[in-house]
Design a protein with these regions (language model features):
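Conserved ABC ATPase signature
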Residues: 127-131, 135
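Short coil-to-helix segment of the ABC ATPase nucleotide-binding domain corresponding to the Q-loop/switch region
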Residues: 86-95
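Conserved ABC ATPase "signature" region
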Residues: 94, 105-123, 175
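Helix-to-loop junction immediately C-terminal to a conserved catalytic motif
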Residues: 48
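A short, proline-enriched helix->beta-strand linker immediately N-terminal to the Walker B motif
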Residues: 146-150
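Conserved ABC transporter NBD signature motif
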Residues: 55-68, 110
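The feature captures the beta-strand-to-loop junction immediately N-terminal to the Walker
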Residues: 33-35
Length: 249
C-alpha cells in the first residue's frame, strides 16, 4: 500500500505541493490530473523517491520512502530519450534484470516473455531508432514491467502519441493491470484518459501550492473498451465531474 500524509514541497519560497494526503491500496490504478504546471509530475517524482527533501511522510508497504524503492518502475513521456539507441530492443528490456543474480538465459527468457506481452516479439533484435513512437513506448513499458514491480509510476506516457496509438496503449495498460495487478499511479493532462483508465481519479488544484480538490472513485463496468465504455452515460457523467474540478467550476 502506498500512503502519503500531508506531503508538501517547496523550491525556495515557491510552494509547489501543499498538504497532499492519499492512501492507494495495492492493485489500484490511480490517475492524477490537473491544470498544466500544477505539480503533477513533481508529485509523481516525489512519490518515487526521485526528488528528496519533501515535507510530510510517504510510505510504501509501511516503509518510509527516502530514495528510489527497489520494487519501483517509472515510465516517462519522452520514450525516445529513455531508451539506449545503441542497444537492441531486447537488450534495453534486459537492462534492469542485470542487477539481479539471474543466469543470462533466464534474463533473456524474461525479456522475451514481456516483449510478447506488449506485441514486440518480432522487434526484439531491432534498435529503438528503427521503431515508431508507439513501438518505442511499448519497449519502455516492457522494460518497466520486466522486474514485476509492485509500484509503477507513469508520467504522461501517451501524451505525445497519435490518437490511435494512444488508444492501443491505453488498452494494453488495462490488460497488463488486470493480469499483473501492480499498483499504478498515472499522471495525465487528458480528462477522458483519466476516467477511461482509472479505478480512481485525483484532481490537483492550480499552483502555487497544489492541493487535492477531487478524489473520485471510477466505477465502470468491465472489461472497458474504447467504443462501449466512452459511450456510457456513467462515463460522460464522470468526465464532466472531473472536467469541472480541473477548471474550478
Amino acid at each position: 500500500m502506498l500512503r502519503l500524509d500531508e506531503v508538501g514541497r517547496h523550491y525556495g519560497d515557491h510552494q509547489v505541493l501543499h498538504d497532499i494526503s492519499l492512501t492507494v491500496p495495492d492493485g489500484q490504478l490511480l490517475c492524477v490530473v490537473g491544470p498544466s504546471g500544477c505539480g503533477k509530475s513533481t508529485l509523481l517524482r516525489t512519490i518515487g523517491g526521485l526528488l528528496p527533501g519533501y515535507e510530510g511522510t510517504i510510505t510504501l508497504d509501511g516503509t518510509p520512502v527516502r530514495g528510489v524503492p527497489d520494487d519501483l518502475a517509472v515510465v516517462f513521456q519522452d520514450y525516445a530519450r529513455s531508451l539506449y539507441p545503441w542497444l537492441t530492443v531486447r537488450e534495453n528490456v534486459v537492462l534492469p534484470l542485470r542487477r539481479r543474480d539471474l543466469p543470462r538465459a533466464e534474463r533473456r527468457a524474461e525479456a522475451d516473455r514481456i516483449l510478447a506481452r506488449v506485441g514486440l516479439t518480432d522487434a526484439a533484435r531491432r534498435h529503438p531508432w528503427q521503431l515508431s513512437g508507439g513501438m518505442q513506448q511499448r519497449v519502455a513499458i516492457a522494460r518497466a514491467l520486466v522486474c514485476r514491480p509492485s509500484l509503477l509510476l507513469m508520467d504522461e506516457p501517451f501524451g505525445s502519441l497519435d490518437a490511435q496509438t494512444r488508444e492501443d496503449l491505453e488498452d494494453l495498460l488495462l490488460e497488463v493491470h488486470r493480469t499483473d495487478g501492480a499498483t499504478i499511479v498515472f499522471v495525465t493532462h487528458d480528462i477522458d484518459e483519466s476516467v477511461y483508465l482509472g479505478d480512481r481519479v485525483v484532481v490537483l488544484s492550480p499552483g502555487p501550492g497544489a492541493e487535492i480538490v477531487l478524489d473520485l472513485p471510477v466505477e465502470l463496468p468491465g472489461p472497458r473498451d474504447q467504443i462501449t465504455t466512452r459511450g456510457l452515460t456513467e462515463f460522460v457523467a464522470l468526465r464532466s465531474e472531473v472536467g469541472r474540478a480541473v477548471r474550478n467550476r
